[in-house]
C-alpha cells in the first residue's frame, strides 16, 4: 500500500485500489522529515495535502477573492481626511469625493454602480487663466507688478521698520559732544576696527587680505600685543551693538528701489549713477540726519536727471519710494553740497574717472540752468540765488527740472517702489 502511494506513476492503480477511500478517510498524519530537523523530529503533514503535493491528487482550485471593504470616511487614503488642507491649484475647487467621481444610475442586471473617470479640459482652463491680471499688492495705490508677491510687501515693511528703529539710527553730533573735536589713538582704533568688522561682514575673504596687526599699526600701536587689541575692540563693539550688524543703508535701498530695472543700457547707467551718489553720501556725516530710503530716492532722482536730462520724479516714483514732492522740499538734502563734495576727490581708477566725468557733465548742465528765471517751489523753502556761482552748483537740480513741466522722469512706478514722491526728495536733493 505504501509503495502504491509513493509511486506517482501508478495513478490508475491507486484510483482503482479498493483501499483508496479508506486511506483518504484516514486523517492520520504521516511522518515527513524536515530538511532542518536533522532527522530527529518528523514533521506531521495532513494526508490530503501530502497526496496533492506528490501529484497523486489534482490540486485544489484557489478560493475566490473576497471583495475589499470600502475605506472608512476618516481613512488617510481618502480626501475626506484632509478636507480644506488639500492644495488648491488656481481656480480649481478642492479635491473631494463628489469632484473625483460622479456615480451613474445602476445598469440593468448589475449590483454595483459604475463610476466613470473624471476628465478635465486643460485647454479651457488655460484659456480662462490667460486673461487674469498680474498679481499686485493689496494696497490701493499700488499699480506696479511685483516680482515675488507673497514676500514683496514684507520685505518693504521690514526695511522701513529697521531704518526708523531708534537703535539703528546714528546719534547726531555725538563726537562733538563727547570728544570735543579731539582725536586719540584709542578712537582711531575704534574707527579702524569698525571698518575691519564691516569688511569681514560683507566679504568672508577679508581675513586673507587685511591683517589685524596692520590695522592696529596704522592706528599707532606698535607693541607685540596689537593683534589682541584689535580682537578685544571687536568684542567690545559687537557687544555694544548687540550683534546687530545688518541694518539697511542707502545702498540697500538703491538696490531695493531698482530691483525692477531691466538690463538695458539706460537703466544700467541710472543704477550705476544712483549707487555712486548713494555711496558718496556715506562719506559725509551730515547725511546721517536723513533716512537711508530718502537718500537712496534722492540718489535715484539725480541719476535719472543726469541720464535723461529732464524732471526725474513722477507719480509712480513717489509711490515706489514713499516720498512725495512736498516731503522732499521740506526735509530732504540738496544737490549743491553733493556736487561740491564729489568734485573735490582725486580719481585714480578708470571707473572713478568715468564717474567723475559723469559728475562734471552734470555740473555743467546745472551751471547752464543757472541762467534760468527760477520759479519758487510751492510749499518749499528755497533761498534766492544771486550772482554767478555756477561752479558752486548754486542752482539745485530740482529747480532746473521743475522749470520743465513737459517731461517727467520720476515716474509713478519709482514713486510707488521707493515710497517717496518728488516733493519728498527736494530738500534731500538740495543737501546733496
UniProtKB/Swiss-Prot annotation:
Q: Name one Pfam family in it.
A: Cyclin_C
Keywords carried by this UniProt record: Cell cycle, Cell division, Cyclin
User: What is the designated name of this protein?
Assistant: Putative cyclin-F1-4
Q: Which GO terms describe its biological process?
A: cell division; G1/S transition of mitotic cell cycle
Q: What protein family is recorded?
A: Belongs to the cyclin family. Cyclin F subfamily.
Q: Which domain of life is it from?
A: Eukaryota
Gene Ontology terms for molecular function: cyclin-dependent protein serine/threonine kinase regulator activity
* Keyword Cell cycle (UniProt): yes
Which organism's genome codes for this protein? Oryza sativa subsp. japonica
Q: Which Gene3D superfamilies match?
A: Cyclin-like
Q: What GO cellular component is one of the record's annotations? A: nucleus
Q: Which InterPro entries match?
A: Cyclin, Cyclin-like_sf, Cyclin_C-dom, Cyclin_N
Amino acid at each position: 500500500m505504501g509503495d502504491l502511494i509513493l509511486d506517482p506513476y501508478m495513478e490508475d492503480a491507486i484510483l482503482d485500489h479498493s483501499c483508496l477511500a479508506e486511506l483518504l478517510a484516514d486523517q492520520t498524519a504521516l511522518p515527513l522529515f524536515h530538511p532542518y530537523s536533522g532527522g530527529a523530529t518528523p514533521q506531521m503533514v495532513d494526508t490530503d495535502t501530502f497526496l496533492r503535493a506528490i501529484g497523486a491528487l489534482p490540486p485544489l482550485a484557489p478560493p475566490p477573492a473576497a471583495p475589499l471593504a470600502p475605506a472608512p470616511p476618516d481613512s488617510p487614503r481618502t480626501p475626506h481626511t484632509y478636507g480644506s488642507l488639500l492644495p488648491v491649484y488656481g481656480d480649481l475647487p478642492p479635491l473631494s469625493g463628489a469632484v473625483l467621481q460622479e456615480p451613474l444610475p445602476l445598469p440593468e442586471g448589475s449590483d454595483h454602480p459604475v463610476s466613470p473617470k473624471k476628465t478635465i479640459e486643460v485647454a479651457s482652463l488655460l484659456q480662462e487663466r490667460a486673461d487674469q491680471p498680474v498679481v499686485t499688492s493689496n494696497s490701493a495705490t499700488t499699480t506696479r507688478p511685483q516680482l515675488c508677491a507673497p514676500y514683496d510687501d514684507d520685505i518693504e515693511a521690514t526695511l522701513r521698520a529697521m531704518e526708523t528703529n531708534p537703535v539703528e539710527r546714528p546719534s547726531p553730533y555725538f563726537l562733538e559732544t563727547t570728544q570735543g573735536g579731539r582725536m586719540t589713538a584709542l578712537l582711531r582704533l575704534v574707527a579702524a576696527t569698525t571698518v575691519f568688522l564691516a569688511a569681514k561682514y560683507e566679504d568672508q575673504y577679508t581675513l586673507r587680505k587685511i591683517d589685524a596687526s596692520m590695522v592696529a599699526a596704522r592706528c599707532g600701536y606698535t607693541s607685540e600685543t596689537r593683534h589682541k587689541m584689535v580682537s578685544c575692540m571687536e568684542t567690545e563693539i559687537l557687544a555694544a551693538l548687540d550683534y546687530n550688524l545688518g541694518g539697511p543703508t542707502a545702498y540697500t535701498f538703491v538696490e531695493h528701489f531698482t530691483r525692477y530695472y531691466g538690463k538695458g543700457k539706460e537703466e544700467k547707467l541710472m543704477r550705476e549713477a544712483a549707487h555712486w551718489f548713494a555711496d558718496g553720501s556715506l562719506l559725509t556725516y551730515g547725511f546721517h540726519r536723513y533716512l537711508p530710503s530718502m537718500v537712496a530716492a534722492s540718489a535715484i532722482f539725480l541719476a535719472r536727471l543726469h541720464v535723461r536730462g529732464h524732471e526725474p520724479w513722477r507719480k509712480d516714483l513717489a509711490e515706489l519710494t514713499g516720498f512725495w514732492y512736498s516731503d522732499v522740499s521740506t526735509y530732504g538734502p540738496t544737490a549743491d553740497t553733493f556736487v561740491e563734495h564729489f568734485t573735490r576727490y582725486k580719481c585714480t581708477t578708470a571707473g572713478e574717472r568715468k564717474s567723475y566725468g559723469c559728475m562734471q557733465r552734470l555740473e555743467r548742465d546745472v551751471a547752464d540752468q543757472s541762467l534760468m528765471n527760477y520759479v519758487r517751489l510751492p510749499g518749499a523753502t528755497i533761498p534766492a540765488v544771486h550772482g554767478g556761482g555756477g561752479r558752486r552748483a548754486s542752482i539745485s537740480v530740482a529747480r532746473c527740472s521743475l522749470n520743465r513741466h513737459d517731461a517727467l522722469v520720476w515716474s509713478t512706478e519709482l514713486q510707488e517702489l521707493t515710497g517717496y514722491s518728488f516733493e519728498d526728495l527736494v530738500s534731500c536733493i538740495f543737501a546733496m
